[in-house]
Amino acid sequence: MEPIKRYIESVTNGNLWIYVLSLGKEREVIEAETTKLIFEKFGFLPNELMIKTVLFRLKNDGYLSRERFKSQKAFKTTEKGLKELEAMKSYSSNLIQKL
């Protein structure tokens, strides 16, 4: 695999939590729409099973809250999740400056 393809894979499908936390930072997100929203906003189509796994882990660890929206399972990023997202942004920004 070419280096750029490996890099793109690692920062997209390899780090789905970043995209999930970002989606839920401003509003409730219906879980069933997560894959579609990631595709629309970030331009790649993640694996549905991986999305479910990431949602489960982020909820259990307190980074996402369990919500209901239009009678469907939904989530919203918690304060803990927002702090983690900001830490990731800061780290990425510092790394890009060094590159």
Ranges and model annotations:
Residues 44-60:
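Short amphipathic alpha-helical interaction segments
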Residues 59-70, 76:
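Beta-hairpin "wing" of winged helix-turn-helix
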Residues 71-88:
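Basic, amphipathic "hinge/linker" alpha-helix immediately C-terminal to the N-terminal HTH DNA-binding motif
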Residues 83-99:
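Amphipathic alpha-helical dimerization/coiled-coil segments
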Residues 1-27:
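Short alpha-helical segments that sit at the start of domains
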